[in-house]
């Protein structure tokens, strides 16, 4: 592990200073906000000691990027000027390929998408070209007419892990999030945009429109997905005609991912596709486990849920039986009780790398930061939310 120097981050994490402001503009009560503050601080402390000598976490780009985003979103004074953050970005920069992708050995789309989010969170103009190149790479991965695939293909509009691997909703939702993170800056009507910026906006719009075609084929909603495999409960499956929950069953992680992706792709919240996804969520609301999947991918589920609910902009999920579930309160308390004494989180079920405490702790911190934030902050350039 790296020898640490006494920086602002060190002083913040190892002092009595609070991360969350005394009177936070938060959607949770002050008592819970203080518990979240302590939890985030403990998690960041633990991650502080896990950084490798090469600046990475676990020597892996996507995991490193998730950790960097967790730090950058926790406090506005955390910046790339901090040595540990700079070292992390130096590792990511070393993973940049000539075609704009950001990865080491495998899964170029997955890694590039998550690294792109971190580069945007850095809010550093020095990375503008890195961001543009990564966006161009992701848009180039989309399956469409340029790959001799027509709109009647089940895979049209999708994105997979990269290369020749077939598309799936999980990879597509990361790519959409990576594109959408700084949307508000891009769509500022008062800004005099260059032709390049205008063309980039047009390119993103086309990317979203094609992605929505693929999303429809992952949704169990027959009026938008008339394929024979489609059920009609409004939820989402992993890929057209196949679900990790068996058959073509809708399940929670992908339904939250689908909801989030539609909103990021600028589908109106009153659109039947969005409302049908929410109706599935309201009928299958769960916190302790992920519906139909148990503990498999549980922390992925938590961070996707927090992002989706923030994007959807509601404070309570109303179940068909009339029960109102304050999702921020429910999810925060669940995550708080799952934290270890050392400050990290880990899943006893190791599927999808969730026996890796660095990955799972990064997921959880991002979820807690969403919980503590404002719904409308979801696509802001640098989402420091309430931490001041």
What are the residue ranges of the model-derived segments?
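Positively charged n-region of N-terminal signal peptides that target proteins for export
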Residues: 1-5
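Secreted/extracellular ectodomain signature
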Residues: 44, 89, 385-387
